[in-house]
Every structure is written in C-alpha cells, then in structure tokens.
Amino acid sequence: MAEQECPVTNLLLLGRSENGKSSTGNTIIGEKYFEVNLFGRDMDQRCKMFRALIEDGPIINVIDTPGLLESSVSGDYLSKEIMNCLTMAEEGIHAVLFVLSITNRISQREEFTFNTLQQIFDDKILDYFIVVFTGGDELEADNQTLDDYLREGCPEFLTRVLKLCGGRKVLFNNKTKDKGKRNKQLNQLLAHVTDIRQQNGGIPYTENMHRKIKFKNLKYSNVKL
C-alpha cells in the first residue's frame, strides 16, 4: 500500500517522564526516536513528532510532550503547548494517550493536569482519551493482569478518569523484545483508536474544534452573567 493511500493516525502522549511516556512512544514507533536517559526520563525539552509505518496498517504520527506535567508548569503553558501539538498534527489528534505507571503513585500533578485539560478543552477531549499503563513487565513477573492490579486498589481519581474515557485502557511492556507481545499491545491500542474514530464519526480533535468549544463556553458564560 502506498504511503499516501494509508490512513494517518495522530497520537498525543501526555504523562510524567518517569512513567515511561517517551519509551511508550518508542515502543509504538518501533524505533528509539524519543530520547530517554537511564532512568526513563525525557531528554527532549520540546514537543516532537515522529512517524511509524505499520505493516498493513495506518501511518502513525506520535507526538511527545516532554515536561508538561512538571510542578513548575502553569495551566497557561500547558494550554499553549497542547495548542502547538494541535498545529503540529495537521489532520488533528485522533487519540490522547494519558500515560501512567503501575510502579509509580498517581501524583497531584497528574490530577492537576487532567483537571486543567478538562477546563481548557472541555469534556470533549475525553472522547479521545486512552489510559496507557506502563510496567507490564512488572505485572508479568508477578503473574498478574492489568485488571488484577486495578482490583487491588484503584485510586478514586483513576476510577473517575477511566469512567470518563469510557474505560479505554491498555497495558504496555516497553522492555520486552518479544515481537509478538509488542504487536499484541500495539493492536490493543489501535483497537481503542478505532473505537474513538467510530464514536466521533471519524472526526479528530482539531484546533478549529477547540476554538468553537471555547467560543461556545464564552458565549454561555456571558449569557449566565
């Protein structure tokens, strides 16, 4: 299939660097394009996009957003950078991957970011959310599944996030060299992306959509006043 005939899927990565966000991007692409150090932290300081060509599948553009969940980042900066990502992805964003780790506790920063995204981009952005859990190797070592992990004690915040995004979740093992396992987790992710496309009528989240939502909310607040 010629590249220009393939559908394009734009995926936006959000999450703390120590959650394996950039490593997840590399796993999706199949190459180590996003730089990470020995501790799994991002080395890049700017939003970057790299492309993967999936055999008999879509063209995948993965956009990484390093540093957006750091404690020093303001809501205004977060909004600006996400808008830059929307501009970078000309066709719009087909899915937002909210990357968490089973080995790290959910921080107040992640709650702040999630709540800020809702405020800035309205609940519509949640229609494109997929929660990606890293640390699949840890669960495999303990002979556990993701559902086992969540049943053991799911924080209230995470329960709310999963409910708001329709329960879309996937477990990633970014350390495995097993091609079959890598393909399986990628296919699970892409199945969620297909679900998002169907639910949204094939329409990605775009900069223009954000402007319309922002104008509508502003108009509504003026009417209330």
From Swiss-Prot:
Region of interest called G3, as start-end residue ranges on this chain: 64-67
Gene3D superfamilies cross-referenced by the UniProt entry: P-loop containing nucleotide triphosphate hydrolases
GO molecular function: GTP binding
Disulphide bridges: none
G1: annotated span: 15-22
Listed InterPro entries: G_AIG1, GIMA/IAN/Toc, P-loop_NTPase
Annotated segments matching region G2: 42-46
UniProt-annotated stretches for the region G5: 173-175
Tissue distribution of the protein: Mostly expressed in pollen.
AIG1-type G domain segment(s): 6-214
Highest taxon of source: Eukaryota
Alphabetical keyword list: GTP-binding, Nucleotide-binding
Binding site for GTP: 15-23, 174
Protein family: Belongs to the TRAFAC class TrmE-Era-EngA-EngB-Septin-like GTPase superfamily. AIG1/Toc34/Toc159-like paraseptin GTPase family. IAN subfamily.
Identification of the protein by name: Immune-associated nucleotide-binding protein 1
